[in-house]
Amino acid sequence: MKKFFFLFLALGLIISGALPSFVGAHESSEGKKHAFSKQLKAISKKTYCYFEDFTNEETGLPYDAVRMKDGEISPQDFTSPTNIGMYYMSTVSAEEIGIISREEAVSRIQTSLETLEEAEKWHGLFYNWYYTKDGSLMTDWGEFISTVDNGWLSAGLIVAGQAYPELNDQTSKLVDAMDYSTLYDPEVGQMRGGYDVKTESLTAHHYGAFYTEPRVASYISIGKGDVPEEHWWKMYRTMPDSWDWQSQKPEGYTETYDGVDVFEGHYTYNEQKYVPSWGGSMFEALMPGLVLKEKELGKNALGLNNKRHVDIQIEYATEEMGYSAWGLSPAATPDNYSEFGATPLGMSGYSAEGAIVTPHATFLALDYAPKEVYKNLKTLKDFGAYGKYGFYDSVNVKTGEVTQAYLALDQGMSMVAIANYLEDGIIKDYFHQDEIGKNPEELLKKETFSIN
């Protein structure tokens, strides 16, 4: 989602906090589960402190990131639609877990909504960057309307509106005004990457790969009625087998859904079949499942594939790469921001050579491998990767170097994943209560991937 993690100012102070001690080997299974839940709640409390300390009180907009070093904290005091959407869902999560009161949650989100109502937009869609101090447009990196980022803001608005009915009028008006048809290419049946307002041009590329994080924007666009349902079937499960640039030649068959032929292709890793993402990263695969009921409704497709990606991520990192911890996904590095993934899981897989592991990838796996998550968190804690605002953004598991940074996006993914695990999928429930989340559910149910 973020192709670059922009140059940082001075780096800031490590403020460490003790991670709740992990459960002992002799406790009962139920006792371990209860203790692990307590640990996750304690982690979520620290994680949400990021949004408490780094959200502008006047505008309700969260900072993009902070870095820490040598007694200084360097905040990135601009934000994106994705950051705002994750802030809303994190705030709902914090209230559901019991970290903040309902009144505080409503107040926080309402302040932010008032800023969004006045913010500059294009066909109701939000630009990529705004200053947190006043909600004004930030144009340092252009004037871009991002399909995927608007999708995550829409998701956050939908969740907030369902969690707090008194905010629903505001959230619904904002979502209704977001016209995704302007980003849709009916000739191809796919969403464009976005629109450059300055040059008045759509991106040349489309979001053609199905199993990536933009599928949330696609789902919402269909749920709103901005684009036709056939769009869901026009995305590639794998690229056609004749496209020889992809990392594997896919196997599979053609299935017809709603009159559209879909090549149900798959790749294979150590005899495990899966539908690939673009880069093989955890957040491409599992971030959409924070709001979409893929596990519950897509048992023969997305839900099963999510489990395969978790299993292969763990196997690839620990066995093939020989790392002591797993969780390969784009993350901050000591000097920048880079893309990492389990290379075989991607059509054009990101590298895993840097040995950079990011904690948000661990939390995203909670629904599919809680025991492995517990063990991995303990390993990451042993690297010293836990501080005042929860887990730092990444650690080099070969050198032990911890990237002393926190990103709003990654903090948000961790918060929502924990809330869904502790509160039985509460964020997904709120999303699917809305007609936009409910209307396309049949698309999740009816498909069967060729990985069964």
Can you annotate each of these PLM segments?
Residues 17-28:
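Sec-dependent signal peptide cleavage junction
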Residues 1-4:
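Positively charged n-region of N-terminal signal peptides that target proteins for export
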Residues 26-452:
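Ser/Thr/Asn(+Pro)-rich, low-complexity disordered segments
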